[in-house]
Amino acid sequence: MKQSMVFSPTLREVPADAEIKSHQLLLRAGFMRQNASGIYSFLPFGLKVLHKVERIVREEMERAGAVELLMPAMQAAELWQESGRWYSYGSELMRMKDRNAREFALGATHEEVITDLVRDEVKSYKKLPLTLYQIQTKFRDEQRPRFGLLRGREFLMKDAYSFHATQESLDEVYDRLYKAYSNIFARCGLNFRAVIADSGAMGGKDTHEFMVLSDVGEDTIAYSDTSDYAANIEMAPVVATYTKSDEAEKALEKVATPDQKAIEEVSAFLNIEADKCIKSMVFKVDEKLVVVLVRGDHEVNDVKVKNVYGASVVELASHEEVKALLNWEVGSLGPINVTGDIEIIADHAVASIVNGCSGANEEGFHYVNVNPERDFKVSQYTDLRFIQEGDQSPDGNGTILFARGIEVGHVFKLGTRYSEAMNATFLDENGKTQPLIMGCYGIGVSRTVAAIAEQFNDENGLVWPKAVAPFHVHVIPVNMKSDAQREMGENIYNSLQEQGYEVLLDDRAERAGVKFADADLFGLPVRVTVGKKADEGIVEVKVRATGESEEVKVEELQTYIANILK
């Protein structure tokens, strides 16, 4: 492709609203442009990268036995109502009405549509297992779109769905697609981890996320320093043991703590360590109020609270709700003298506290010498806190460290969550009606492009891995007015294309500095500069990733490039 014919508008300045490298560079290099908040156009170079990622995804999905189809982006509300998610999915689901006032959703995901499709066509175990996938635009009304393609309102996604007669069949396909995902992200050149995850609004139980390691990632990964254990911090169990001291219990005492609300403030004011304080939080668990207790130096993990109750929705009660429903002061919440049918659950660490402190549910007061079970009753002790760096790894090997990650893929074992809700059944080999067992497997294709850009860049621009680069080689005649440079550049361009390389020829009448700056910004793997030594049959070859350059004779160029790109 000749650069003079390409629509690739570059920017010299960093856009003011672009916070992270990938967003900045994809805009500056002319790979995309914003249409509205969280909505982008892919320009020609960006589209080529997107297509490269799509091709890798398709190859690995088909190798894993999945078959491609395409479902509608616009989905009837009745299907979402049938599954129950019309009411529970939340405000991220974009809803609309047609001219006849019939309700629809723009597809945020396609479990309902695929389940409806398969239930009408697959009636026997003989047609199972079946794995179908699509690559299609998705829509989510993000409250705060940010970071360019990493959190948008419109994005390209690969979503696959598998249907099974037995759990063993699901396990087999799940493992196969787990490996396919690992292959996809490895082929894209990414540094990633597969981690144990929470299924969230998707439902189901067993699930893994594929996380690209990056400081700008919105998720925290907890991983072992000596084993391959890795989990989303929400899902990492705490295996620590706590020893209760033999200190004699003291008499409960209520003390004034004026203007002291945070654990750090209270512990400093009372001259007591934070790990002897009891942190109390009120949650709405499917609208039921629950008091959750953790140690003062720990944080409540609401996903674990949700899993304790098998709840659909868990959210922290607001200050106003706590005051109105319980007449408690949020800055001084505590478990003592809790009345009514409000349940108290506590993290294991709370049971070991002796002569601790807690809020008194009264403005400006706390209790000291608090002892669980003597001063208040707990209905259940369980794991309710976030794991911390330095904790023992849940697999028993090593200690936990943290890293940030960008989620680019997610695989779920949905089980019968959707098939039972939507009456999607088949006849088993005994002629009995059974619900289809399902799996779900998603990849953020456009998000993967951003994740690659986030991992592969330097101070001068993008540095694309060869598997996804829009072109393999960038040929730059420095002076297009020089017949020797222009003709050699075109000859190299043509011969490399004949060898199967994708080549970009900078045939613009621009200054050398502009051409080189754009080349660095585009980030193609190899740059061939045709300069003053063209008359001698010598060009300069530069590797973008390393910055290494070398003068090469034209007759040796193809072999030299082949060695770089092998």
Swiss-Prot record:
Xref: Gene3D superfamilies: Anticodon-binding domain (3.40.50.800), Bira Bifunctional Protein, Domain 2 (3.30.930.10)
Pfam families given in the database record: HGTP_anticodon, tRNA-synt_2b, tRNA_edit
Enzyme Commission number, as recorded: 6.1.1.15
Catalytic activity: tRNA(Pro) + L-proline + ATP = L-prolyl-tRNA(Pro) + AMP + diphosphate
CDD domains: ProRS-INS, ProRS_anticodon_short, ProRS_core_prok
GO BP: any one term: prolyl-tRNA aminoacylation
InterPro entries found in the cross-reference section: aa-tRNA-synt_IIb, aa-tRNA-synth_II, aa-tRNA-synth_II/BPL/LPL, Anticodon-bd, Anticodon-bd_dom_sf, Pro-tRNA-ligase_IIa, Pro-tRNA-synth_IIa_bac-type, Pro-tRNA-Synthase_IIa_type1
Keywords, comma-separated and alphabetical: Aminoacyl-tRNA synthetase, ATP-binding, Cytoplasm, Ligase, Nucleotide-binding, Protein biosynthesis
GO molecular function: aminoacyl-tRNA deacylase activity; ATP binding; catalytic activity, acting on a protein; proline-tRNA ligase activity; transferase activity
Annotated compartments: Cytoplasm
Gene Ontology cellular-component annotations: cytosol
Similarity remark: Belongs to the class-II aminoacyl-tRNA synthetase family. ProS type 1 subfamily.
Functional note: Catalyzes the attachment of proline to tRNA(Pro) in a two-step reaction: proline is first activated by ATP to form Pro-AMP and then transferred to the acceptor end of tRNA(Pro). As ProRS can inadvertently accommodate and process non-cognate amino acids such as alanine and cysteine, to avoid such errors it has two additional distinct editing activities against alanine. One activity is designated as 'pretransfer' editing and involves the tRNA(Pro)-independent hydrolysis of activated Ala-AMP.
Comment, domains: Consists of three domains: the N-terminal catalytic domain, the editing domain and the C-terminal anticodon-binding domain.
Subunit note: Homodimer.
The protein's name: Proline--tRNA ligase 1
